[in-house]
């Protein structure tokens, strides 16, 4: 299968070389964590002398004997080379029970630069502080962005065609190897079902998957809608699915921990405080929705909103849903001292639709940038101080358009 260098992620790892931290590569299943690790190993071998690379891949039967943490520890120590910079890479580390005991011991010796990846359900962001006694840095890997998708296909189609395809295929690049739509959908659906019906069931000892699956499908079908565990519980109960808001709240957390969804909380712009009552959920990859639900209730405005949310997260922004009086701002994106207010729409050619998007932004009185992202087909232009951007241009050139 063809691969492309994921420069942004690779540069981030390069910048962390030889820092005194455990580097933990996380992300949804099949997002490219293992390939990224291999690319970094090759970079080290190509550019540095006097290095010693110790690589363990627990998906490879050659390392089956190391699935016991004492054996793992002894194997690494035996391969340490005095006088060289020693780099330790462990792929699918969760396949060694109690792996953290070996990793923590090796880290404490201060003689290895350690990098690990693991299955999304067993190496959760929420668990890292508990697992590792030393410092760690998380490198979170997302599925392909639209820009990476275009690079993969060498931009040999017009942008309009590439964009239409991306809204269906999404960014799980393993699916690109298949020539038919059915095979691509089956691949993505298998990735999704492995997480929901195997990884999460095993991780949390869930008695059955019906509630979890119906919850996940509900969230997919309601991307960009504010919701809460109580609302979802009531809806499922009406469909004769026995559950309660406590269970739904836990299951939502599990799905987010495994990076199937990202939860986006509300922010009161006027009161400058975060609101807890309801939130929105966005899929980690838009291709999952099409693979699981097909075109049912397909709303491109919501699809575009999901794409914009993911792009903001990829770029390191903290993302919130804005509330201003009774109005809603799709996204308030913050990164350090930066802040951007963003509205997303599929089509703003109708005056009424355009007004619905810009009116809330005009009520915000601070000087931070305010933008509307839509499928305009036009170069960037301004209205009352608001920048209007074509979604394809923004996804490809966001650093130039913000």
Language-model features: locations:
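Short glycine-rich substrate-engagement loop in P-loop NTPases that contacts/grips substrate
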Residues: 54-84
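Conserved lysine of the Walker
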Residues: 33
């Amino acid at each position: 299968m063809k691969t492309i260098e994921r420069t942004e992620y690779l540069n981030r790892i390069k910048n962390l070389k030889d820092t005194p931290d455990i580097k933990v590569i996380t992300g949804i299943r099949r997002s490219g964590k293992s390939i990224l690790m291999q690319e970094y190993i090759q970079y080290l071998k190509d550019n540095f002398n006097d290095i010693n690379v110790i690589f363990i891949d627990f998906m490879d039967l050659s390392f089956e004997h190391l699935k016991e943490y004492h054996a793992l520890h002894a194997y690494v120590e035996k391969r340490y080379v005095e006088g060289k910079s020693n780099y330790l890479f462990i792929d699918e580390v969760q396949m060694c029970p109690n792996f953290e005991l070996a990793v923590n011991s090796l880290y404490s010796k201060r003689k290895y630069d350690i990098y690990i990846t693991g299955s999304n359900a067993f190496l959760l962001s929420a668990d890292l502080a508990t697992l590792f006694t030393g410092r760690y840095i998380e490198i979170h890997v997302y599925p392909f962005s639209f820009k990476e998708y275009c690079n993969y296909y060498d931009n040999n189609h017009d942008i309009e065609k590439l964009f239409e395809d991306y809204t269906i295929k999404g960014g799980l690049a393993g699916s690109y190897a298949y020539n038919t739509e059915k095979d691509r959908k089956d691949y993505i659906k298998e990735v999704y079902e492995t997480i929901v019906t195997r990884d999460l069931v095993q991780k949390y000892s869930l008695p059955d998957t019906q509630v979890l699956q119906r919850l996940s499908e509900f969230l997919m079908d309601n991307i960009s809608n504010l919701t809460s565990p109580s609302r979802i519980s009531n809806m499922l109960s009406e469909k004769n699915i026995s559950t309660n808001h406590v269970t739904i709240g836990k299951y939502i957390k599990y799905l987010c921990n495994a990076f199937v969804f990202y939860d986006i909380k509300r922010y009161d712009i006027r009161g400058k405080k975060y609101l807890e009552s309801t939130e929105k959920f966005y899929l980690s990859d838009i291709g999952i929705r099409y693979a699981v639900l097909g075109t049912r209730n397909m709303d491109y405005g919501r699809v575009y909103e999901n794409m914009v949310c993911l792009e903001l997260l990829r770029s390191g922004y903290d993302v919130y849903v804005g509330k201003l009086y009774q109005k809603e701002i799709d996204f308030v994106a913050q990164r350090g001292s930066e802040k951007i207010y963003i509205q997303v729409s599929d089509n703003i050619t109708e005056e009424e639709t355009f007004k619905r998007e810009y009116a809330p932004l005009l009520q915000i009185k601070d000087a931070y940038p305010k933008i509307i992202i839509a499928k305009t087909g036009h170069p960037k232009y301004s209205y009352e101080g608001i920048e209007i951007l074509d979604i394809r241009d923004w996804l490809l050139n966001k650093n130039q358009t913000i």
